[in-house]
From Swiss-Prot:
Subcellular location: Nucleus; Cytoplasm; Chromosome
Any single biological process term in GO: regulation of meiotic cell cycle
TM region positions: none
Gene transcribed to yield this protein: Cntd1
Keyword DNA-binding assigned: no
Cyclin N-terminal domain ranges (all copies): 29-180
Function: Plays a role in the different steps of crossover formation during meiotic recombination. Participates in the crossover differentiation step of crossover-specific recombination intermediates through its interaction with PRR19. In addition, stimulates crossover formation through the interactions with RFC3 and RFC4 and simultaneously regulates cell-cycle progression through interactions with CDC34 and subsequent ubiquitination of WEE1. May also participates in an active deselection process that destabilizes or removes excess pre-CO intermediates.
Keywords: Chromosome, Cytoplasm, Meiosis, Nucleus
Protein name: Cyclin N-terminal domain-containing protein 1
Gene3D superfamilies: Cyclin-like
Species name: Mus musculus (Mouse)
Tissue expression from the record: Isoform 2 is expressed in spermatocyte.
Cysteine disulfide links: none
Lineage per the UniProt record: Eukaryota, Metazoa, Chordata, Craniata, Vertebrata
Amino acid sequence: MNMEGPLRPRLVNCSDFQFGVVTTETIENALLHLAQQNEQAVKEAAGRTGSFRETRIVEFVFLLSEQWCLEKSVSYQAVEILERFMLKQAEDICRQATLQLRGKDTELQSWRAMKEQLVNKFILRLVSCVQLASKLSFHYKIVSNITVLNFLQALGYVHTKEELLESELDILKSLNFQINLPTPLAYVEMLLEVLGYNGCLVPATQLHATCLTLLDLVYLLHEPIYESLLRASIENSTPSQLQGEKFLSVKEDFMLLAVGIIAASAFIQNHECWSQVIGHLQSITGIASESIAEFSYAILTHSVGANTPGPQQPVPHKAARALRTAAAAASSNT
């Protein structure tokens, strides 16, 4: 493979994704593995989790991935890699600052220099995360070093190939080379596969395209959507800082996000089958139907506005109780 050749455009076709070609045993094992990873991620939800999924950052990654004709999964993977790397860097800076504040004033410059370097290299790190994510999807297109360097130069950032490789290596080392973790898309596609085997009335391929659009929306409107969920869970329009911190585990629950995305997609595609889809999702994941309905309600409210399942089915208060219980249970485990 020529890593330095020009990157030719490739349109991502949602119909390329095929359902129903994997054995049920493989699906069961994969779903169990995803559920275990999700449970671990929810338990480890920390104070600053989600800080770098800010709308402008996500939009930058999405637009860059589109410009480079990358597959959808690369965009989500890049956002998650960047999120975890930047959090790790921020934690290291805070730890260094705490240690050096106890020392001499001259040593104080060290952590400040680290912070300045982090800010100055942010665009380079972001682009490196996209490039790393593209390498995980090696069956599509890998972004070449020349493509990255030309892009950075167009923005006014001059770097060498060596600096680009060092940036990738810094990210890999910081994350202990653990960058191939599941994104919300993996949960969505796995659940769609199971729905197909369970006889869901809405075809999985039909739901898949809508799920991709709604997943983009949730990433871009991450804060408003989860804020509305938080307000519903506590039945209060002004949550306290403590309540917000306890809700972090819900923000990191990719399985909950996936069922909400699928339920919202089902309502858009065929609202008459909405309740059936929610029932299937509940039996598959064990997540309360009220919680699934509330999440889909929040997504639909921020996407199509009116004509959501809210007026027809009074789910918000029931879902609020379910989400409140989930948040309380998660916080008690931390």
